[in-house]
Design a protein with these regions (language model features):
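N-terminal secretory signal peptides that target proteins for export/translocation
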Residues: 1-15
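Acidic low-complexity segments
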Residues: 10, 91, 112-193, 200-209, ...
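Bacterial N-terminal signal peptides
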Residues: 18-31
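Intrinsically disordered, low-complexity N-terminal segments that are enriched in acidic
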Residues: 34-125
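Solvent-exposed, acidic/flexible segments
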Residues: 54, 154, 158, 172-179, ...
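Glycine-rich, acidic and aromatic/proline-enriched surface loops and short helix-turn segments
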Residues: 181-195, 225-228, 232, 267
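Hydrophobic/aromatic-rich core segments of domains that either
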Residues: 221-313
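Low-complexity, Gly/Ser/Thr/Pro-rich intrinsically disordered linker/tail segments
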Residues: 289, 293-368
């Protein structure tokens, strides 16, 4: 089994080819982040589908898998256990890799996938430099039309959101300056649930409108509002999904859940990451999360309204951890377990040795 990963600094896999493709590629290289810290993670991740309904037939599952991104470098990836049907697919809309497998209920073991991988995660800071950013052009907006959609579900640019964006940004043309205004606004307007408890009180639909009403308290709600505000001003913005790896859980079997964050595009900088929810809980250090991300997270997926490959019977708006269908109907009962160890001072010789091994065999199947 082989995977060709996107260039580490490209910021994405190629999913569309425009006459302006050179602009897309160069903008990605411009976004290669300045690293201020690195952590090497060794991770074991498993998925198992459970609680199948009586009389169930076909079981299909699409699950998150890691790959090279601007702030992370995959050094090794192994499939430890999986059905014979396992394959790596790419969704055509976002170009991201997924683990896909299918089987028949009641025949053999439950649908179970276990992987192990090593990933070098970078802490980045200071990427939102307004002095280096240029104004967005018509060419930029043509190239990134997908990230400028005004009608994307739960991130619609309504008249209310358009007015808020215009009132905040005024005549400002610099995308970084505008995005910072939106970042500060969402923090002032909303509260992430973790400020008050351990579980969200909202619906967690990733809804800009819910966030405005004060009933959306998840990271997806806060970032949906930020994205809608950016798009209202013609600033391309996209949604990224990952997981935070809390040092307190090192060596423990657990499900780390998910954390999303957006990236907006600025000429001269490329795609700039930020985390409104982390900023919201950081007090007077909120600004560190505008153009910066910690190395205590992994990136998995991107976008909404997923066109999975092979095509799912139901097209999901959000995919958190994975998507399972039983006889063509969504099935939410599956477990995800992660266990990780970390090295906060990885030696370059060690990383280089693993990377050399990876170059010869990117993905190995070591068990069934």
């Amino acid at each position: 089994m082989n995977i060709t990963s996107p260039n580490i600094c490209s910021g994405r896999s190629v999913r569309s080819w425009y006459p302006s493709a050179l602009l897309v590629l160069l903008s990605g290289f411009a976004a290669c982040p300045p690293v201020v810290g690195e952590t090497l993670y060794t991770v074991r991740q498993s998925y198992v589908v459970k609680d199948l309904p009586e009389g169930a037939g076909q079981v299909r599952g699409w699950f998150w898998m890691p790959e090279d991104r601007p702030e992370q470098r995959m050094l090794e990836f192994r499939v430890v256990e999986a059905p014979e049907s396992l394959k790596v697919t790419r969704d055509p809309r976002y170009g991201r890799s997924w683990l896909y497998a299918e089987g028949t209920a009641g025949v053999g073991k439950p649908l179970r996938i276990v992987t192990e991988f090593k990933v070098l995660r970078s802490k980045v800071s200071g990427l939102a430099d307004a002095d280096r950013a240029g104004e967005l052009t018509a060419e930029d907006r043509r190239a990134f039309a997908e990230e400028l959609r005004l009608d994307e579900k739960h991130m619609e640019v309504t008249p209310t959101i358009q007015k808020i964006a215009d009132d905040l940004a005024g005549n400002e043309k610099n995308p970084v300056v505008q995005a910072r205004k939106f970042f500060d606004y969402v923090i002032a307007k909303s509260d992430h649930y973790s400020k008050f408890g351990s579980t969200p009180q909202g619906k967690c639909w990733g809804s800009a409108s819910e966030c405005l009403l004060g009933t959306g308290d998840c990271c997806t709600d806060q970032h949906a509002l930020f994205i809608a505000l950016c798009r209202a001003r013609g600033i391309p913005c996209r949604l990224i999904y990952g997981s935070r790896l809390n040092p307190k859980n090192e060596g423990k079997d657990h499900d780390p859940g998910y954390r999303c964050w957006p990236k907006f595009y600025a000429p001269g900088l490329g795609w700039v990451p930020l985390d409104v929810s982390s900023g919201d809980t950081a007090g007077d250090r909120a600004a560190e999360w505008f153009g910066g991300l910690d190395d205590g997270r992994l990136e998995w997926a991107e976008g909404r309204d997923f066109d999975l490959e092979p095509r799912s019977s139901v097209r999901p708006d959000l995919v958190i951890r994975g998507w399972v269908e039983v006889d063509g109907k969504p099935h939410s009962a599956f477990d995800r377990v992660v266990n990780f160890s970390r090295d906060e001072s990885p030696s370059m010789s060690r990383v280089g040795a693993v990377a050399t091994e990876r170059a010869s065999t990117q993905v190995a199947v070591i068990g069934k």
